[in-house]
């Protein structure tokens, strides 16, 4: 990192990130980054002999034996956040971390080749982003003010993989359990548009069934967005997950709606992925976190 430059981000590989963990005594970070856990030892003298230290000193990430304070501050946010917002993005179908490679060694920290992952972490009012692409992780400060700013980051990330216009469909809400059951049998038919009768009976239009079938069977790109809050040593996930899927019929957004008081039924929203509706989906994810207001909640 050139300290004379206006750039503030750093990029290291997984081994370099683990060395930063060792220097700062950080045991682990968000599991989506697929980093190795660090176990404290009596001495870190061995780090000075590691060839990666010379590289990080050249880049200004490490000064002497100490991590650059800006970098250290970001790493501490990643180590003990109040909140994390996670986006898993993929070209093609999202594999959710499953690497289909028989030659992959046990304990591998690889992620699928078609994926990249974004973790937005907040501690106090300090927001940090960590982006993993291949074997590299880029860490930087990030500006987050509301759900719209998070939605914009998600859309920008998806657009960097694949462009799609919002699908030309009408928004619809359907019972979640019924939708999951209907989709399971629909999948067995290869998402054939003529086999979507159960979906049509739920009030989903023929055009929406067609666009949804294209996006589910052969997506050009996907993203899943969810969040976690921390309280002391406990953590709690958002009840809702936002999914964006790019099919030949356009980009579709799906998310579980927040339950209303007194309602025992969960509902799924299916809608065109316009910026406004993506923002609604992100807001729903954040509103379904368990420990209160996402902007101000503190883990302690």
Swiss-Prot record:
Record's keyword terms, sorted: Chaperone, Cytoplasm
Keyword Oxidoreductase (UniProt): no
Gene that specifies this protein: espG5
Domain of life: Bacteria
Protein name: ESX-5 secretion-associated protein EspG5
Disulfide bonds: none
SUBUNIT field: Interacts specifically with ESX-5-dependent PE/PPE proteins. Binds PPE33 and PPE18. Does not interact with EsxN. Monomer in solution.
Role description: Specific chaperone for cognate PE/PPE proteins. Plays an important role in preventing aggregation of PE/PPE dimers. Required for LipY and PE31/PPE18 secretion.
Major location category of this protein: cytoplasm
Organism: Mycobacterium marinum (strain ATCC BAA-535 / M)
């Amino acid at each position: 990192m050139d300290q004379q430059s206006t750039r503030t981000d750093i990029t290291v590989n997984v081994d370099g990130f683990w060395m930063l963990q060792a220097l700062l005594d950080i045991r682990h970070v968000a599991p989506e980054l697929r980093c190795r856990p660090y176990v404290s030892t009596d001495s870190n003298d061995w780090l000075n002999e590691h060839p990666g230290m010379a590289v990080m000193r050249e880049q200004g990430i490490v000064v002497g034996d100490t991590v650059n304070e800006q970098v250290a501050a970001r790493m501490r946010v990643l180590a003990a956040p109040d909140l994390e917002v996670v986006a898993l993005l993929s070209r093609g179908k999202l594999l959710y971390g499953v690497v289909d490679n028989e030659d992959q060694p046990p304990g591998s920290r690889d992620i699928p080749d078609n994926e990249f992952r974004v973790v937005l972490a907040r501690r106090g009012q300090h927001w940090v982003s960590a982006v993993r692409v291949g074997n590299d992780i880029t860490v930087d400060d990030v500006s987050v003010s509301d759900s719209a700013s998070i939605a914009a980051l998600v859309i920008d990330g998806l657009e960097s993989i694949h462009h799609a216009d919002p699908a030309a469909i009408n928004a619809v809400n359907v019972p979640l359990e019924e939708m999951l059951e209907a989709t399971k049998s629909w999948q067995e038919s290869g998402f054939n548009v003529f086999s979507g009768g159960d979906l049509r009976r739920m009030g989903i239009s023929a055009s929406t069934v067609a666009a949804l079938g294209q996006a589910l069977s052969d997506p050009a790109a996907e993203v899943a967005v969810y969040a976690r809050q921390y309280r002391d040593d406990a953590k709690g996930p958002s009840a809702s997950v936002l999914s964006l899927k790019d099919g030949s019929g356009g980009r579709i957004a799906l998310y579980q709606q927040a339950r209303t008081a007194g309602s025992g039924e969960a509902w799924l929203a299916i809608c065109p992925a316009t910026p406004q509706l993506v923002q609604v989906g992100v807001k729903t994810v954040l509103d379904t976190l368990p420990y209160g207001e996402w902007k101000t909640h503190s883990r302690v």
